[in-house]
């Protein structure tokens, strides 16, 4: 998820990479007569990076938005149908416990990568236990650096999350990769946008209630 940008920052060619991507997108998205529209995905909003200089008509939809919220993952019904189609309906409870729990917009969804991998293994061995398919698919160096910098309060909040409690935080959706670990408060925005935490509602003053989504992440 963050692997490419972690390498850019670590090896100190971040500005050069931003310039390269800006030129690439300019050619591919603006001066391409054969392109009707483009759909781009990522963890963090990229508007502040200026990689879209010269382009317009963008619509940014984050995991906080309700539009297309069910398209960010599998719904309960979709997972039930998938399991049933392979004769694995009895494995729904553990699938839900391990891979459900994400709240995108107004929808509750599962991580597709995990569900697909678990069903694939169950199809050959119905005694297989759920496991962590997710962590090895991403780079976590930025998260580790932020946690290493954590003060006593932040570590206490992490412990509260691990035991199943919620914490309330203001999140920023305007971070850029090169400023992520400049402030320990950015930790919560990074954990949220990269899937380690999910939304459990809002407080009256607009803060987000955050929780660990499922057993896999714990």
In which residue ranges do the predicted regions lie?
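A structural signal for short, well-ordered beta-strand segments and their strand-loop junctions
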Residues: 37-42, 109, 198-199
């Amino acid at each position: 998820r963050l692997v490419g940008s972690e390498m850019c920052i670590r090896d100190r060619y971040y500005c050069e990479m931003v310039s390269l991507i800006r030129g690439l997108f300019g050619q591919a998205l603006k001066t391409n007569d054969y392109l009707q529209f483009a759909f781009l995905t990522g963890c963090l909003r990229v508007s502040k990076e200026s990689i879209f200089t010269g382009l317009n008509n963008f619509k940014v939809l984050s995991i906080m938005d309700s539009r297309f919220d069910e398209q960010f993952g599998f719904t309960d019904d979709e997972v039930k149908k998938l399991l049933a189609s392979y004769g694995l309906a009895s494995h729904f409870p553990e699938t839900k416990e391990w891979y459900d729990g994400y709240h995108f917009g107004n929808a509750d969804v599962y991580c597709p990568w995990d569900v697909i991998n678990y069903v694939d293994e169950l199809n050959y061995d119905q005694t297989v236990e759920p496991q962590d398919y997710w962590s090895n698919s991403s780079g976590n160096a930025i998260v580790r650096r932020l946690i290493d910098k954590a003060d006593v309060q932040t570590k206490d909040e992490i412990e509260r999350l691990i035991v199943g409690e919620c914490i309330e935080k203001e999140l920023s959706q305007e971070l850029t990769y090169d400023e992520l670990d400049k402030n320990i408060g950015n930790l919560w925005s990074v954990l949220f946008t990269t899937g380690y935490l999910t939304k459990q509602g809002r407080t009256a003053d607009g803060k987000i209630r955050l929780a660990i989504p499922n057993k896999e992440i714990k």
